[in-house]
Amino acid sequence: MQTHNFLCIISVILGCSAQFYVIDDRIGLGREFDGIGGLSGGGATSRLLVNYEEPYRSQILDYLFKPNFGASLHILKVEIGGDAQTTDGTEPSHMHSKDEGNFFRGYEWWLMKEAKKRNPNIKLIGLPWAFPGWVGYGTQWPYFFPNVTANYVITWVMGAKQHHNLDIDYIGIWNEKAFDPTYIKVLRDALDRAGFTNIGIIAADGDWSIASAMLDDPYLNDAVEVIGVHYPGTNTVKEALLTERKLWSSEDYSTYNDDIGAGCWARILNQNYVNGKMTSTISWNVIASYYENLSFGRDGLMTAEEPWSGHYIVESPIWMTAHTTQFTQPGWFYLQTVGKLNHGGSYVALTDRKGNLTIIIETMTHEHSQCIRPPLPHFDVSPQIATFELKGSFAHLADLQVWYSKLDFKSGNGTLFKQLRPIRAHNGLLSLKLDVDEVFTITTVTTAQRGFYPEPPKSCPFPKNYTDDFTIDNPPFSEAPYFADQTGVFEYFRNTTDNSSHAFTLRQVVTERPVAWAKDADQTISIIGDYSWSDVNVSCDVFIETPKTGGVFLAARVDQGGESVRQAKGVFYWIYANGTYRVTNDIGGKRVLAEGLSGTKAGVWYTLTLSVKGYFATGSLNGFPLWKNAAVLEPKSGWAALGTLSFEYAQFDNFNVIAG
């Protein structure tokens, strides 16, 4: 290793015009460090990850969770699926109805196991964004019957243990929605009675308002172990400090994962503690593994959105994470001697109380560290020399390891997580020449590594000719590859009433509106393919299960999903159980392009074919033209999709799409 030309080692007699910062444990320690984490869900943000083939899927997981390799995350937080749209898709509930339970739906169980496989000490958190409709008894409020909601959540905790041998460490309340003190206390009591006294409650995963309620209600204060706030801008409030509870930024970042996103992440990882005394920061999301044209595309620590090609990108936020995670562990303590640098930037120091010391320094500039929210007040950062004086139990330290990153916005040739030559402290003093947009880790820890795998396959678009007949005996996941549910839940289904051509199908299984988090559509929909597709031929066998009122659709050029799914436009070809069809320009059916009689009914398989080319669309039923040349002025492109008229059972088979 070469000596970095920005490293400056001085002694007392050198007389540099440096600013001095004391690192000392004699005045006592600060708060206990709880770890850095990532969030899968809220929603469906890891949807495409599961469909990667090996070895690429395992490589991605190593970059996220393997200790001393990449991000080396200490915490994994997952959505407790609630059958509803929760940002980039729906995640299935373990209980679609109160009378059933299935602990193998979705992929969060799998992801938690993969994280634990790599790091047995990783902390696990579950948080609901939405709830199946039965929990709300037909309302949009999950707190009317707090015992029902608490038991629903505890069933998920028990399923994690009994079916996957996963011990959940923390449970949340209702993401970014109103909290209910009665429910929180009922949940605490129910957890204790079920034997989960070790599981802590995080509340309320929104703003700081719960802190005042906790000060007014000692029983609520006792029930909550962690105050979790979202996007705090690195600041806390007096009431939260007065509770004497752990303070976490339990969802943060949510920023496009280029170098500015890396600057945002590096800054808040330090300053959430320096300014706000928050001892954990969790990134939404852990990995951008969903169609990029959905909400908040690429707002993850790394990107894996092409399972069909195997391509993924280890983005710079991974290495900003490593500057903290590879040199600390939950259970370490911040020192009281942390703070801001005189010419901009910040530093934190942590110890394991066994002689190890880690100092993390960041000098991110305002323009190069803006997160998606909240707005960032102006501040200045300039080059500087910072001298750290090691005192107390650290005074004897001589050689310390140095890891360095530089986000170079001028040349574009930055440095990410590079190990430099050790720095030697002289008489307890060590100095660094700091430029802007840099991160240094100075540490006694010697186990860090910059993990590396060979380049993954090159990026390529979704296949232009794609077919799925959904025939699989023991599917590893409940969803078919690449389909991304945006309202409702579409699962592999073994059709015991048809052992011939439709024995294996894809079935929509949510039959009542969930207690929603976002504005789900009134129709169910699952998208697939390439957002740039314009001229498309889509076909699928469909089976309406609801007599008289049921209906299904096949669609092309679908231009919206996520939280905007209600506004989705495209070409939607519907058939109904009442013997009619419609072609609409939107999912809500407000703009009708064609309509008429189809002779369709429930309980019969039909083959729908939708062809869209240029400004015209044509549809057939069982191979015979049903309508043609419907004028389509917009949208110009979008995904293919399938779905149902309402929250109802329906089946799909032999899906095929050919893009021009």
From Swiss-Prot:
Keyword Signal assigned: yes
Q: Which residues are glycosylated?
A: N147, N293, N356, N413, N465, N495, N499, N537, N578
What is catalysed by this protein?
Answer: a beta-D-galactosyl-(1<->1')-N-acylsphing-4-enine + H2O = an N-acylsphing-4-enine + D-galactose; beta-D-galactosyl-(1<->1)-sphing-4-enine + H2O = sphing-4-enine + D-galactose; a D-galactosylceramide + H2O = an N-acyl-sphingoid base + D-galactose
Q: Catalytic positions?
A: E176 (proton donor/acceptor), E251 (nucleophile)
Q: Which GO terms describe its biological process?
A: galactosylceramide catabolic process
Q: Look up keyword Disulfide bond and say if it applies.
A: yes
Could you give one GO CC term from the UniProt record? membrane
Q: Which residues form the signal peptide?
A: 1-18
Q: Which top-rank group of organisms is this from?
A: Eukaryota
- The disulfide bridges present are C264-C371
Cellular location(s): Lysosome
* Chain sites annotated for binding substrate: T87, W129, N175, R373
What keywords would UniProt list here? Disulfide bond, Glycoprotein, Glycosidase, Hydrolase, Lipid degradation, Lipid metabolism, Lysosome, Signal, Sphingolipid metabolism
Report the PANTHER family cross-referenced here: GALACTOCEREBROSIDASE
Its biological purpose is as follows: Hydrolyzes the galactose ester bonds of glycolipids such as galactosylceramide and galactosylsphingosine.
Name this protein carries in UniProt: Galactocerebrosidase
